[in-house]
Amino acid sequence: MIVNYLKHKFYNLLTTMVVLFIFVLSGAIFLTFLGFGLYGLSRILIYFRLGDFTYNRSMYDNLLYYGSYIIFGYFIIFAVEHLMDYFRKMLPENAYFRGATFHLISYTVATTLFYFIIHLNYVYINIDFWVIMVIIGFLYVCKLQFYPESKNLNNRK
């Protein structure tokens, strides 16, 4: 009975470790590709003298510094989008939460909050506000293009 219990416990532990390994490996691959993409973007910004990145320590310090910049920025933009969607659902008749005005307000609030909450605190990343506006605007347009607004894409009427 104890041997059976330990065998079952070992099987559960092994399964958990395999799932954890797959999760960590896929996350590492995603972060690697994200890092290469951001490295390319930073090289473009440096080449055209649109940005300056002066934090150069060890690889892990750089990964933590620049990675936290991206992660915190993502959470700010994510929070603004969900808050704006919540307002749109709560106030469907309000003209500010319909059409292009809604998207312009969402984009403006997200960009402004990102700049003042995240960007100004990272003193080793020097990018002008208008460059940040263009980058976030491009990402916002891509989000609208590839993730269109709909209640249910599989619902055919």
From Swiss-Prot:
Domain of life from the UniProt record? Bacteria
Its membrane topology: Multi-pass membrane protein
Q: Keyword set for this entry?
A: Cell membrane, Membrane, Transmembrane, Transmembrane helix, Transport
Q: Which InterPro entries match?
A: SepA (IPR031396)
Gene Ontology annotations for the cellular component aspect, listed alphabetically: plasma membrane
Cellular compartment(s): Cell membrane
Q: Where are the transmembrane segments?
A: 18-38, 63-83, 100-120, 122-142
The answer to whether UniProt assigns keyword Cell membrane to this entry is yes
Q: Which Pfam families match?
A: SepA
Asked if the record carries the keyword ATP-binding, the reply is no
Role according to the record: Involved in multidrug efflux.
Q: Which family does it belong to?
A: Belongs to the multidrug resistance efflux pump SepA family.
Name of the protein in question: Multidrug resistance efflux pump SepA
